[in-house]
């Protein structure tokens, strides 16, 4: 555990372990090697501030704060039922109302939530992290 604290500035607690267990199968299927698996797992354990990859920083610099503030308001209505299927339904409706496609905003969401430009499926990540954590991570970029 001290290795992770010194190298990555994270402390693996029970919440981190729970999140890792829920997301590990998806991460394993997307990882080419053990190093990539470890890197793609860090966002489940990270506290603020998130470590942002150079590629993800490009997306974060271009974030349209208004869209993501509106998205958080809409997602907040599902806080007590923050499951993948419900998140997909809400996002789909939101995107239609805004005249957008998922591909228009997915990389921005991924960058703000994970600090990465590549990750497991975003709806799975959102469910595992939960609304409060998602809100904290997105707000740190749109307010900061």
Model-derived segments and spans:
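Small-residue-rich helix-loop
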Residues: 1-98
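Charged substrate- and nucleic-acid-binding regions of tRNA-handling and nucleotidyl-transfer enzymes
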Residues: 82-144
């Amino acid at each position: 555990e001290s290795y992770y604290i010194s190298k990555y500035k994270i402390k693996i607690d029970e919440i981190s372990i729970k999140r890792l267990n829920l997301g590990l199968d998806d991460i394993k299927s997307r990882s080419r090697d053990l190093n990539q698996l470890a890197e793609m797992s860090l966002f489940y354990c990270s506290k603020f501030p998130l470590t942002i990859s150079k590629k993800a920083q490009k997306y974060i610099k271009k974030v349209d704060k208004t869209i993501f503030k509106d998205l958080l308001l809409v997602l907040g209505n599902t806080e007590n039922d923050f499951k993948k299927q419900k998140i997909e339904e809400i996002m789909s409706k939101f995107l239609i109302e805004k005249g957008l496609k998922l591909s228009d905003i997915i990389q921005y969401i991924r960058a703000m939530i994970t600090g990465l430009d590549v990750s497991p499926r975003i709806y799975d990540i959102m469910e595992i992290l939960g609304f409060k954590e998602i809100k904290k991570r997105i707000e740190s970029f749109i307010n900061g």
